[in-house]
Amino acid sequence: MFKRFNSREDIKGTTPIKSSIQRGIKAKLVQAYPNLKQVIDELIPKKSQLTQIKCEDRLFLYTLNGEIILFQHFDGPIIPSLRLVHKCPDAFTQVRVDRGAIKFLLSGANIMIPGLVSKGGNLPDDIEKDQYVIVTAEGKEAPAAIGLTKMSAKEMKETNKGIGIENVHYLGDNLWKTILE
C-alpha cells in the first residue's frame, strides 16, 4: 500500500481532530483490538491533539505529535502503524514467518503460506479471513509488518501454498520513512 507513497506529493491537507471524533477513533481501535483497552489512554492521551492528514487515493493518516500512528483507506477500518504497534506489540494478533521469508517481507512482498506454516513460522488457529495481523520474523523481537489475511488459519494450513497475508505496511516502506514536522 505504501510502496509508492510520497509524502511530498501525496499529502493534500491536514485537519486537527475534535475531541469527540478522537474518542470515537479510540473506541473503534479498542473494538477492533480489545487488548488495547488497558493502554489506549497511554498511547493516545486524552488531552493530546490528533491530526488527520488527507492523501491521494482516499488515504487518511492520523498523527500524534508529528508521528504517524494510524492510517485508514476510505471508509475502511482504522489500522495502527508500526510505530504504534512497536509501543505495545502484545495488544495485537501476531503471526511469525520463518527466516527465509524475512528479506521478502521487508521488500514489501506478500506473505506466502509456506513461510507461516513451516517450522520457524507460527500461525495461531483463531485467525480469520480479512483480519489485520502483526507479522513478526523468526529470531527477531520487533514486529516487521502489518498484513491483511487472505484466508483463515485453517484454510492456510489445509492448502499450504499461495499468498496467505497481504503485506499492507512494513519496516522501511515509505510510510515508515515519512517524518512530519
Swiss-Prot record:
Transmembrane segments: none
Listed GO MF terms: RNA binding
An annotated GO BP: formation of translation preinitiation complex
Location(s), subcellular: Cytoplasm
Summary of the function given for this chain in its UniProt record: Involved in translation.
GO CC annotations, alphabetized: cytoplasm
Quaternary structure note: Associates with ribosomal complexes.
Main location: cytoplasm
Organism: Schizosaccharomyces pombe (strain 972 / ATCC 24843)
Coiled-coil residue spans: none
Family affiliation: Belongs to the TMA20 family.
Residue span, PUA domain: 92-172
Protein name: Translation machinery-associated protein 20
Gene3D superfamilies, per the entry: 3.10.400.20
Keyword field contains Protein biosynthesis: yes
Keywords assigned by UniProt, alphabetized: Cytoplasm, Protein biosynthesis, RNA-binding
